[in-house]
Amino acid sequence: MGIKGLTKFIADTAPNAIKEIKIENLMGRVVAIDASMSLYQFIIAIRDGDQYGNLMNEAGETTSHISGLMSRTIKLMENGLKPIYVFDGAPPELKGSELEKRGEKRQKAEELLLKAKEEGNLEEIKKQSGRTVRVTKKQNEEAKKLLTLMGIPVIESPCEAEAQCAFLTKYDMAHATATEDADALVFGTKILIRNLNANASSNKNKNKNSSKRGYILTEINLEQVLKGLKLTMDEFIDFCILCGCDYCDTIKGIGSKTAYNLIKEYNCIENIIKNIDQNKYQVPDNFKYVEARQSFINPKVLEKSEVKIDWCEPKIEELKTFLIKEHNFNEVRVTNYITRLLKARKVTTQRRLDTFFTTCTKKSTKLIIEESQKELLKAKGKGKKRELNDNSTKLNAKKKKTNIKDEKKNTDKMDELKNKSDENFVKDEENDQDDYDQNLFDEKTNSDSGNIKNENIKEDISSNDITMDIPKCTNDIVC
C-alpha cells in the first residue's frame, strides 16, 4: 500500500520535487527495481484472450511473470539502464495485521470474480482478477533463475525490498529506486522512479503523443521533498506514519493535510498526542508508531559490504533450456529475445557523457571586483577594513611602480629616436613613432568563437514485446 495519499500531497505542496523524465535520462544509470512489485504488475498485465487468464505452459503453470520480466528487462537495457532486481525477504512482524487485511480483500475479490464469470461480465472479470493476484514463492524463484541466466544482478533482501533498494541509493550503489510504493522515500531513497514498468513496454502501449515525448517516467527527489515541505527527515517519517502506513494504525480523523499541519506545529507524534483534542481525534489503543518509526529508520537490510552486484555474461544454452524446454516458449521468439539481449548489453556498457567532463569556471575581472566590494562592505571591525584597504593600497602601489617603469622605457626610446642624425631624420622619426604608437595603443587580438551544435539522435528500436497494459498501483489493488 505504501503511504496513503503521499504522492498527491507532495505534488500539491512541494511540486518542485516531482518531475517527468524520459527513460533516456537514465541511460548508464544503475536502477534498483522492486522485483515483487514488477512481477505483480506483469501477472496482472499479460493476459491470454478476453477471459483475462494468465499465460501458461503445458503443465498449466503461469508464465506471465517470466514473459513480462524477460521482455521488460531487455527493453530497459536497450534504453541504456543497468537494472538490479531486489526481492522481498520475510515480511516484518509489524506488517502482520496489514497482510491479514490484504488476505481478506483477496478472498472477497475471488468471490466477486466467480460471480462475474458466471454472469459473463468481462469488465468485472478484469477488475476482480487483478485483485486476486499474488506472487507465489515458486514464481519468485523462477524469476531469480531467469535473471541469473540473463546475467542480471539479483539481490535478496532480508526483509522489505523497497527498504533494500533505498539503502542501495544511500550506499551510492544505485542511482534510484524503481517501485510504485511511495514508502521507499520514507526508507530514504534519494530518488524514486515510478511508472518504469508501464513506460518501457512495447510500441502498442505508447500513448498518442509518445512518438514525440518518448517514454515518460515520474521522478521524485527526496531532498527536494524535504526542502519543499520544510521538514527534517525525522519529521517526514512521523508525517508519513500519521498519513497511514503498513506498520501500524493511525489516528482517526487525521488526513495528510491535518497531519502536515500538526507536524509543523508539534514536530513529532509524541507532542501531537499530548496536545490534540482526543475527543475529536481518536488515538488507537495500541498505537505502535514508535515501532513503525524504527522500522523506517533502521530496517532489516544487507550492509554495503554484504551486497554483491555483478553483471555476468548470459548463459545462452541454459537460458534456452529454461525457456523452451521447461516453460514451452516459442523457439523463434526465444532466439529473438537472446539476440536483443546480447545487443542491449553493449548499450548498457556505454558511459554517460557527464562522467567524462568536469566543470571548470574562471571568474571574470568584473566579478572579482564586485566580490571584493561586497567583501569590503561585509568586513566586520576596523581591523578587517584596514587590512582590505592595505591590500588595495599595495595593489595600487604595484600598478604605479609598473607604470613608472613603462614610462621610463618610453622616455629612453624617445631619446634614442631624437639622437638619430641622418638626412632622413624627420621621416625616420615619424615612421618609428607611428610604429611605436601602433604597437603601444592599437594592438589587437582576434579570436574565433566556436559553436557546438546539439544534434538530436533518434534511435528506433523495434521489438516483439507482448502488449502490457500496466496499471498504476492504487489502494484498491492488493499489492
Swiss-Prot record:
Which sites bind Mg(2+) 1?
A: 34, 88, 160, 162
In residue numbers, the region (Disordered) covers 379-455
Q: Which GO terms describe its cellular component?
A: mitochondrion; nucleolus; nucleoplasm
Region of interest: Interaction with PCNA: 349-357
Return the EC number: 3.1.-.-
Q: What is its main location?
A: nucleus
**SMART domains the UniProt entry points to:** 53EXOc (SM00475), HhH2 (SM00279), XPGI (SM00484), XPGN (SM00485)
- Which residues are involved in binding Mg(2+) 2? 181, 183, 246
Obligatory cofactor(s): Mg(2+)
I-domain: annotated segments: 124-266
Subcellular location per the Swiss-Prot or TrEMBL entry: Nucleus, Nucleolus; Nucleus, Nucleoplasm; Mitochondrion
Q: How is the cofactor bound?
A: Binds 2 magnesium ions per subunit. They probably participate in the reaction catalyzed by the enzyme. May bind an additional third magnesium ion after substrate binding.
In the record, biological process GO terms are:
base-excision repair; DNA replication, removal of RNA primer
Q: This protein's superkingdom?
A: Eukaryota
The UniProt regions of compositional bias labelled Basic and acidic residues, in chain numbering, are 403-428
Detail which positions bind DNA. 47, 72, 160, 244, 246
Q: Per the record, a Pfam family?
A: XPG_N
Q: Which UniProt keywords apply?
A: DNA damage, DNA repair, DNA replication, Endonuclease, Exonuclease, Hydrolase, Magnesium, Metal-binding, Mitochondrion, Nuclease, Nucleus, Phosphoprotein
Q: How is it modified after translation?
A: Phosphorylated. Phosphorylation upon DNA damage induces relocalization to the nuclear plasma.
Q: Which GO MF term does the entry hold, naming one?
A: magnesium ion binding
Q: What does it do?
A: Structure-specific nuclease with 5'-flap endonuclease and 5'-3' exonuclease activities involved in DNA replication and repair. During DNA replication, cleaves the 5'-overhanging flap structure that is generated by displacement synthesis when DNA polymerase encounters the 5'-end of a downstream Okazaki fragment. It enters the flap from the 5'-end and then tracks to cleave the flap base, leaving a nick for ligation. Also involved in the long patch base excision repair (LP-BER) pathway, by cleaving within the apurinic/apyrimidinic (AP) site-terminated flap.
What family is it from? Answer: Belongs to the XPG/RAD2 endonuclease family. FEN1 subfamily.
Name of the molecule in the record:
Flap endonuclease 1
From the UniProt record, report the name of the gene that encodes this protein.
Answer: FEN1
